[in-house]
Amino acid sequence: MSRHNKGQVIVPTGGGKTMCMIHDAIEQFKSGSLKTVVVVAPRILLANQLSEEFLEFIKDVDVLHVHSGETHHTSTTNSQKIEEWHWKSKRHQLIFTTYHSLHKIQKATAMLPDTVYFDEAHNAVQKNFVEAVEHHSMYVLRNYFFTATPKHSLTPFKIGMNDTDIFGQVICNVKAPKLVRQGYILPPKVKIKKFDILEDKEDVAERDSQHLLETLDDNNINKSLICARSTKQIVRLFTDSDFALGLENRGYSWMFITAKTGGVINGKKVDRETFFNTLNSWGQDPHRRFVVAHHSILSEGINVKGLEAVLFMRKMDFIGISQSIGRVI
C-alpha cells in the first residue's frame, strides 16, 4: 500500500485485512499535516466494529460516524454538519460510514478525504453505491478495496471489480491454502444432511427443528451459526416448534437477530449492544454451548469469537457461502 495509491487487497476471511488498514492509517497519521481517513463498511454493525478495532491501536484522533445507527461517537448524516465537523477538528480524523451513506460524504464538497478504505468491497459494485464509490476513486488521492470475494463483470454494461479505472489493479492477493498451511485459518469441512420430503400437513418448523437438533447431536457442535431463509423461518423455529426446548435440554443457550425482530436471547428481546456483547462473551467462554440464528446480519465481516460450525438452511451464492464460512474458520 505504501507503493500504490489505489488498488485491491484480496485476502481470505481471517487473513488480517483490518490490520492492514489500521497499520496503513497509523503510517498516514505520522504525517506532519492533518489527515482524514474514511472507512466504508456494508453494514452499520460492521462500521461500529471497525471503529472499535481501529481505536484499539489509534489514539489522539477525532472520530465521526456517518450512518443512521447508534454510536457513542459523534454521528451525523447531514453533509453540512460533516463539513463543519471536519473544519473544526484540530487532529487527525477517522470517519466510519456505510456504502448506503457514502454519498453524504461525497456531498460534503468543502472537505476531501486523504485515504478511503472500502471494506467488503464486493459491495461497492452495486448500482446504488457505485456512483459515490467512483467519485471517491476519482478525487481522493488514496483508495483501497478490501475483500475476500471480489465480484467481477463480464459485460461493459455492469460494473465489476475488474474495472481498474475505479478499483485499480490487484496489489495483494493472498490465497487461502497459504493461510491454512501457516496456521492462520482452519480448512473448512463440509458435511451434507438430506432432508426428507414433507408429508401432507407435516409441520415445517418441527421438521427443521428435528434436523437441526440431529445435526448438533451427530457432530458434537458446541457453538453454531444458523443461516435461515427468512425472519419468518427463524421466528417459527423458536415459537412454533420444540427447538428451544430441545436446545435447553441439551445444555444450549440460544439467540437470534434479524432486522425485523432485533436481538433475542433465550426468549428475551434485547438491544443490539447487549446482543453482541453477550454473543462475544459466550463465544469466549469454553464451557458455554449456544446457537445463534440469523438471515444475513452476521455474514459479512462481523467478528464472532468461538464459532465452530455454520448450518445452512437456504441456498446462497458463492459470496454468501464464503462470507458465512468465514465466520467460523
Segments (PLM) and residue ranges:
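Post-DEXD/H (motif II) to motif III coupling segment of the RecA-like Helicase ATP-binding lobe
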Residues: 122-185
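Conserved Walker A/P-loop ATP-binding site and its immediately adjacent core
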Residues: 18-20, 33-56, 229-234
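Conserved helix/coil segment N-terminal to the catalytic DExD/H
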Residues: 74-115, 127, 297
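Conserved helicase motor "Helicase C" RecA-like lobe of SF1/SF2 P-loop NTPases
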Residues: 231-258
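Conserved interdomain linker/interface between the two RecA-like ATPase lobes of SF2 helicase motors
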Residues: 168-235
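Conserved RecA-like P-loop NTPase helicase motor core
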Residues: 259-329
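Conserved helix-turn-beta segment of the N-terminal RecA-like "Helicase ATP-binding" lobe
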Residues: 45-76, 245-246
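Walker A/P-loop
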Residues: 4-24
